[in-house]
Amino acid sequence: ETEKEKEGYTKSVKTLLKDCENNQELKKGVEGVLANLIDVPEELQTAIEMSLGMALQNIVTETEQDAKKLVEYLRKNNIGRASFLPITSIKGKKIENIKGNKTGIIGIAADLVKYNKKCEQIIYNLLGRTVIVDNMDTAIRVAKENGQNFKIVTQEGDIINLSLIHISE
């Protein structure tokens, strides 16, 4: 990863990534930061970024033991905190179907991003119950038609989740 790619990460994530680059044993079992493991179409970047929030900085590891090793390293070196997504333990579920009028629905977020197949359960966990729509009117309609059983995000990044509406800046 270049320094430019690390912009916006918390200090502890930046430090951990840098240390992994210089220490092969530490790096073993580390897939990378979630933001670098998904490919998002340009027109959906705001919606996906809002959907994922801070999870974009989560570090994907092969196993729980790999995550544990990194947690111990963070503590031992007083680096700070980071969140981890072990491939072997994360399970996700994707929405089966969206009821009602499909007009304005762009799709299920997990289907709209590209990723390595081995990260599929992580993507389903984080984006499998999120629907991306074109605008707020569609979001409100879809929420009513589906009983708000999932998160709805507009292309502009506004979020409707259960009875909460979050407007992005």
State what each model feature region is:
Residues 2-169:
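Hinge-like oligomerization/junction regions that interrupt long coiled-coil arms in large cytoskeletal
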